[in-house]
Regions:
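Sequence/structural signature of small/polar-enriched beta-strand/turn repeats
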Residues: 2-3
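Compact, glycine-rich, soluble single-domain proteins
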Residues: 6-84
């Protein structure tokens, strides 16, 4: 059975909202190393370094390259603020 898109991902930049969609997983370039978020991940706040945010929605892998940022994870909602 394929995973369901049950994580609400929102990516903001200082200029605009870049993306808002439901995903089944997302990985980030954390300053302490790359990490992945799946459904029901523990609450977390982390800084991000230059790299690629990779997420899967509807079985399709997509990505966004960033310079720096922060991510907050809580209750299947992932909010990201980045500079591109």
């Amino acid at each position: 059975m394929p995973p369901t898109d049950s994580i609400h991902l929102i990516i903001h930049s200082p200029e605009r909202t870049i993306l808002e969609k439901m995903v089944c997983k997302v990985s980030f370039p954390g300053t302490k190393g790359r990490f992945m978020v799946l459904k029901d991940h523990a609450p977390l706040i982390s800084s991000l370094e230059e790299g690629r945010i990779v997420f899967v929605s509807g079985g399709v892998e997509e990505n966004i390259d960033i310079k720096t940022g922060f991510v907050e994870i809580a209750y299947n909602k992932v909010t990201v603020c980045v500079e591109l």
